[in-house]
Amino acid sequence: MKTNRSAEDYLECILLLSQQSEFVHRVEVARKIGVSQPAVQKAVKALTESGFIECDGLHLFLTAAGRDYAERVYARHCIIRDFLQMHGVNALDADSDACEMEHCISEATYQMMKKYVKG
């Protein structure tokens, strides 16, 4: 299923929040991503319709497909971040740059970075 950058950011955010707490709330997602609650509501609707998340009215949950996709996006983020840090980029910039790069680098470039990072 095709997603866009925004959807990937939401899935990654929900994954990270769910690792910190059993329950993820829309307001936490809005705060972490830096968007309005109506923007989160719109994204939740689209991600629910795509089968990536479920919502019980208060809490957001990743479906199996959503968790799998979010984990792949986050793994990509981590490899890029680690690659940048290995090349002297400070941790804060490496993390910020990885957020941008994870959406636009080619699979070949990602695989090269992964091979380099994993040794």
Regions of interest found by a model, annotated:
Residues 4, 63, 106:
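Residue-level signal for threonine
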Residues 58-76:
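Basic, amphipathic "hinge/linker" alpha-helix immediately C-terminal to the N-terminal HTH DNA-binding motif
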Residues 10, 29, 40-48:
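Basic amphipathic alpha-helical segments that dock to polyanions
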